[in-house]
Amino acid sequence: MERIFVDKLFAAEAYTRNADKEHRAFEASKHIYDLAVISDESRISALFENEKLLAGLLSIRLTEEQNRLDGIPGVLPKDFIFFDEACSNPYIKKAYTTMQNQYVLIAKERIELDEAQTKMFALKNELMKCAAWLNAQIP
């Protein structure tokens, strides 16, 4: 679960930065939804307190980003913009509605974009308290 969470953070960032390119906004919207869903999980809350585990997962992902085709090899976690920008991006706003119509089939499991934005702000707030997040370096 913790690795999936970190992977989704990086994916949301990469796709948000390229939301104007084909299918990227749709992919960003899926990851934002997933992050909104799992952000309240106890294992994710515990990850914020486990600097060693978070640092290790970030190091692995930052290394992987160096060779990823759609990656963000020069972007440090502390510089991620998707927390603040994704839910106001016009491409992502449109794609988010489409994504929910296609993938979130149970009405009570839908998360409105405003709520997702609130959850992204809360995630950013928690991560910006973590030394592992703030001090992560590109290998």
Label every PLM stretch briefly:
Residues M1-P139:
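Structured mid-to-C-terminal alpha-helical surface segments
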